[in-house]
UniProtKB/Swiss-Prot annotation:
Disulphides: C44-C59, C51-C68, C58-C86, C70-C84
Primary localization: secreted
Keyword Signal assigned: yes
Molecular function as annotated in GO: toxin activity
Keywords: Disulfide bond, Knottin, Secreted, Signal, Toxin
Taxonomic path: Eukaryota, Metazoa, Ecdysozoa, Arthropoda, Chelicerata
Organism the protein comes from: Lycosa singoriensis
This protein's record includes keyword GTP-binding: no
An example Gene Ontology CC term for this record: extracellular region
Official protein name in the record: U1-lycotoxin-Ls1b
Amino acid sequence: MMKVLVVVALLVTLISYSSGEGIDDLEADELLSLMANEQTRKECIPKHHECTSNKHGCCRGNFFKYKCQCTTVVTQDGEQTERCFCGTPPHHKAAELVVGFGKKIFG
């Protein structure tokens, strides 16, 4: 439902912008690149995939949105870099465990 609202908002914005005076300044290539940027923003990063460059783009899990968890990695050269992945934080894992256990007991 949220995706539909975002697409509708984008279309309303484009239509209102086209009725204004600024549409003549926009070329077709610029409009296509704007729509491509919107599409890539909607795509989310699955669990256990790298999110170093997009720390707020993780997908939703069963109950919660995955969080971007980062660690510092030291290479053989001694250089430190930050690597991040989408995962479930420990407190979310505990909540999912309790809910799963409750479903087994109460059906």
